[in-house]
Every structure is written in C-alpha cells, then in structure tokens.
C-alpha cells in the first residue's frame, strides 16, 4: 500500500479515535479540541478541508494568509512598496522632524507631490538633496530615530586624527604591489 492510500486511512483512524475519546470522557481543554477536527462534521469533510490546520479566523490579520503563491507574494510586496512610497511622499508640514510640534509649516495644494511608481520616482528625482530628503522621510516614517539619521558635529577631532594617522601609516603597505612578499616575511602565528 503506498503512502497516498495510507494517509486517508490514518486520518480516518485519528478521527475515529478522537470520537471514541470524546464519548468516553469530557474534553480535557483547548489542546485536544484545537488539534482535532470538528466532531460535528463527517470524516470526509475533515479530510478535504482540514480546518484544524488552517489559521484561525480570529487571529488572521487582514491581507495575511499562511499559504500564498509566489506570484501573490510578489504582487503584495509591490503593493506594499507602492504604499510606502505614497506615504513617504504624502505632504506633511515636517517630514524630517526638524521643527517643533507647534511650528510646522503648511504645504499648499500646488506644491504637493503626486504619487508616482517607484521606478519613475528614481528617474524624476534629479536633485541629490531631494533624493536625500526623500530617503530620510521614508526612514523616519519607518521609525528610525532622527538623531541616527542626521549626523551630529564631532565633539573632538582627536579620534578622527588618530584614525587618519593610522590609515596614513598603513597606506604604503596596502598600496604596495609586493604585498604578498611582505606578508611572507612576517612571522606566522
């Protein structure tokens, strides 16, 4: 008997066993009830729908599924990407959070940007500052802190100078074409 014929018999036996256990004793909690098929339906219905394996409706978020095709995943990913770019481009008084809450500026309807698809958005943005502002606004809309995105002035140049000195010392080593010959002279650990 091959595995395709064994599976329905096994499911039927499990269903019958569950029926007998329920008749002998009351249910022992949610673990038994959630792992077994519904006792009111026929075994054939349970084998076809397998409702006990599917995601419970009360836990399901809108638009989410457990079993989803690759094409559907791609479509949803493109849809989410479009929604993100639309929300990042949505006019707000202070997309970068640079003004205090009470001092946000209003945008006029003539200056509001019209949402465009992501590929066209990259082509139409010629100004690098506009690109940077767009990326910063998008990152902030995703919850990245403003302090992380906008660099602070250096408190001390000592660290920067020490790093530059270190790079200057090792520059001849890395620029030298005989790097392999130099490494062969070093003792191996």
UniProtKB/Swiss-Prot annotation:
Keyword check for Isomerase: no
Region entry Disordered, spans: 1-120
Keywords carried by this UniProt record: Cytoplasm, Cytoplasmic vesicle
GO CC annotation: acrosomal vesicle; cytoplasm
Ranges of Basic and acidic residues composition bias in the record: 70-87
Subcellular location: Cytoplasm; Cytoplasmic vesicle, Secretory vesicle, Acrosome
Compositional bias segments (type: Low complexity): 14-24, 103-114
Tissue expression remark: Mainly expressed in spermatocytes and spermatids in testis.
Protein name: Testis-expressed protein 22
UniProt gene name: Tex22
């Amino acid at each position: 008997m091959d595995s395709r014929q064994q599976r329905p018999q096994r499911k039927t036996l499990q269903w019958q066993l569950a029926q007998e256990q329920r008749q002998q004793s009351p249910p022992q909690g949610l673990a038994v009830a959630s792992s077994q098929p519904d006792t009111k339906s026929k075994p054939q219905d349970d084998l076809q729908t397998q409702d006990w394996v599917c995601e419970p409706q009360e836990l399901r978020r809108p638009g989410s599924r457990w079993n989803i095709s690759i094409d559907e995943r791609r479509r949803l990913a493109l849809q989410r990407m479009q929604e993100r770019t639309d929300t990042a481009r949505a006019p707000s008084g202070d997309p970068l959070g640079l003004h205090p809450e009470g001092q946000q500026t209003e945008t006029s309807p003539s200056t509001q940007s019209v949402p465009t698809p992501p590929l066209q958005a990259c082509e139409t943005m010629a100004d690098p500052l506009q690109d940077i502002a767009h990326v910063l606004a998008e990152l902030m809309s995703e919850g990245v802190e403003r302090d992380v995105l906008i660099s602070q002035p250096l408190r001390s140049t000592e660290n920067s100078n020490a790093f530059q000195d270190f790079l200057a010392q090792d520059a001849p080593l890395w620029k030298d074409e005989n790097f392999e010959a130099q490494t062969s002279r070093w003792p191996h650990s």
